[in-house]
């Protein structure tokens, strides 16, 4: 019977100054060094992924906008009707839109 792996191990060699700084920050927050490092890394990873997804969506949206703007415009029937109504209004009121 296979058992499911629910945890993974992460090791890192760091400069002693970084280690002492992390240890001090962990102590200030009342957490273990491991808990502190993992929680900060986890939050930073979520933030990085979120920013990347927003950027990727923005690039995709730009491509869609450029594609839409490069196509010739063809008004739909409702827009054509609205233009006809507007032009009729202008002819009835004597107002000229060329000013």
Curated annotation (Swiss-Prot):
Transmembrane segments: none annotated. The gene is tacA. Pfam families: TacA1 (PF08681). It comes from Haemophilus influenzae (strain ATCC 51907 / DSM 11121 / KW20 / Rd). Keywords: Toxin-antitoxin system. PANTHER family: ABC-TYPE TRANSPORT SYSTEM, COPG FAMILY HELIX-TURN-HELIX PROTEIN-RELATED-RELATED. One of its GO terms (biological process) is regulation of DNA-templated transcription. Putative antitoxin component of a toxin-antitoxin (TA) system; its cognate toxin (usually a tRNA acetylase) is unknown. SUPFAM superfamilies: Ribbon-helix-helix. Belongs to the TacA antitoxin family. InterPro entries: Ribbon_hlx_hlx (IPR010985), TacA_1-like (IPR014795). This is Orphan antixoxin protein TacA.
